């Protein structure tokens, strides 16, 4: 389901009923997102999603829509690999103090060669690490 966040309310815009249990795949995610991008064409869109939408392939696909003012912010698993210097490490290996936020710009995410760079916001909660991947959205956070 895709909803419009408006004045602390969520207004459903588009949804699909899945015939299977468990996580949806990239094809199903695109099938739900694409009509909403068309519907809101010309509007600035920021897609936020729960961890089921953490796919680097979905992020790669959505980056193509940046010229249409479509941005995204996705939570990432602690096991997500990022490139730090010449080596890769898990997000869980980053040195972040509880309550601290780090903005890592232009990060190579995963070891997949065709994937571009992303901005990554890392925040350590008392009970874990929250990581958000985005398509250049952090530039808008500073405004």
Say what each PLM segment does.
Residues 6-143:
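Single, function-defining residue in the core of a domain
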Residues 1-4:
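Active-site cores of enzymes that catalyze phosphoryl transfer or operate on phosphate-rich substrates
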